[in-house]
Regions:
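N-terminal helical cap/lid subdomain that shapes the substrate entry/recognition surface
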Residues: 2-94, 99
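Asp-based, Mg2+/Mn2+-dependent phosphohydrolase catalytic module
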Residues: 1-4, 97, 111, 115-212
Length: 212
């Protein structure tokens, strides 16, 4: 069956925000813990909500809330200067839309943060639906975000593909019963995702055209 519904992750897939994410993490850890852990610790949780990632450091809900607030304040201040779309992404996404494909965004960011990223990338009008972490009970890798996007679109899982860069994206898509496509222009390489056996590997944004 031809693919008609294309669901995208945001960070590491459409926009290169990795440096901003890591700077925000380092700033938060210095402010709340007086230390700067290796970036690899944070990268393991990339693609999950902030509240989930900060549980690595504390179980105190009040402290987690404070850490999230510190992170978001720094992230917002530096967002527009450090975020850009990956080369070729805007053209590839708009080509799919021109072909009549249904497009959705499924992100672990809050909806407001996702909209900010799309605006910087020039893609704020490209998607038929956006599902943020503040709109679901169970974030990625749980299937709920993808299932909610499909529900809002009135689209079946057959004919749908979820495109992302992280293990959480691939696991989410597989659990939701859609095809999965792993992008290799983001922070993770093929070896990091190979055991999950995504349906498609995308070396560059131009490869999206072959899925349509």
């Amino acid at each position: 069956m031809a693919l008609s519904t294309f669901l995208f992750d945001l960070d590491g897939t459409l926009i290169d925000s990795i440096e901003l994410i890591l700077r925000s993490y380092r700033h938060t850890m210095r402010a709340h813990r007086g230390l700067e852990p290796p970036d690899e610790v944070w990268m393991k949780g990339l693609g999950t909500p902030l509240s989930v990632q900060f549980r690595h450091w504390t179980d105190d809900p009040a402290e987690i809330e404070a850490m999230v607030a510190t992170y978001r304040a720094y992230n917002l201040e530096h967002h527009d200067a450090l975020v850009r779309p990956y080369d070729g992404v805007v053209v590839a996404v708009r080509a799919l839309r021109h072909q009549g494909k249904t497009l959705g965004l499924v992100t672990s960011k809050m909806r407001s943060g996702a909209l900010r990223g799309l605006q910087v990338a020039g893609l704020d009008d490209a998607f038929d639906v956006i599902v943020g972490s503040d709109e679901v009970t169970n974030p990625k890798p749980h299937p709920e975000p993808v299932l909610k996007a499909l529900e809002r679109l009135g689209a079946p899982a057959t004919g749908a593909v979820f495109i992302g860069d992280s293990r959480h994206d691939i696991e989410c898509g597989q659990a939701a019963g859609v095809k999965t496509a792993a992008v290799l222009w983001g922070p993770f390489d093929r070896a990091h995702l190979a055991d999950l056996e995504p349906d498609y590997w995308l070396e560059r944004p131009e490869d999206l055209a072959a899925l349509g």
